UniProtKB/Swiss-Prot annotation:
Pancreas. InterPro entries: RNaseA, RNaseA-like_dom_sf, RNaseA_AS, RNaseA_domain. Glycans are attached at N34. Residues 15-24 have a biased composition (Low complexity). Its EC number is 4.6.1.18. It comes from Hystrix cristata (North African crested porcupine). This is Ribonuclease pancreatic. The gene is RNASE1. It is found in: Secreted. Residues 1-26 are annotated as: Disordered. The lineage of its organism: Eukaryota, Metazoa, Chordata, Craniata, Vertebrata. It catalyses: an [RNA] containing cytidine + H2O = an [RNA]-3'-cytidine-3'-phosphate + a 5'-hydroxy-ribonucleotide-3'-[RNA]; an [RNA] containing uridine + H2O = an [RNA]-3'-uridine-3'-phosphate + a 5'-hydroxy-ribonucleotide-3'-[RNA]. GO terms for biological process: defense response to Gram-positive bacterium. Residues 1-13 have a biased composition (Basic and acidic residues). Disulfide bonds join C26-C84, C40-C95, C58-C110, C65-C72.
Length: 128
């Protein structure tokens, strides 16, 4: 069975680089990473940074998770991420996604030994 840590990597890690001008990035990646198998996952974030940098967030700023749990951590630095959101016209099994490329601080939930990210909680824009 897929561990929570492996699932996090499958759903959220794409260290190979950013999608640049490929408007099909979300459609391809959501399919390739098995997030459109039994439904169209409505929103998903891919992080374009080395896995070691994302794992390191577990030892950075401790914050509350959206669900009230206390094992979330916010990255000290901005990270290149891509938000994929299902479009209104999307109909399973033809899942279609819009894409936004952002530079934001990420919030992940961590657990286990080794202590690693198991859930992507949020991304935070530069505070104005």
């Amino acid at each position: 069975k897929e561990s929570s840590a492996m699932k996090f990597e499958r759903q959220h890690m794409d260290s190979s680089g950013s999608p640049s001008s490929n408007s099909n990035y979300c459609n391809e990646m959501m399919r390739r990473r098995n997030m459109t198998q039994d439904r169209c996952k409505p929103v998903n974030t891919f992080v374009h940074e080395p896995l070691a940098d994302v794992r390191a967030v577990c030892f950075q700023k401790n914050v509350a998770c959206k669900n009230g749990q206390t094992n979330c951590y916010q990255s000290n630095s901005l990270m290149h991420i891509t938000d994929c959101r299902v479009t209104g016209s999307s109909k399973y099994p033809d899942c279609s996604y819009g894409m936004s490329q952002l530079e934001r601080s990420i919030v992940v939930a961590c657990e286990g030994s080794p202590y690693v990210p198991v859930h992507f909680d949020a991304s935070v824009g530069p505070s104005t």
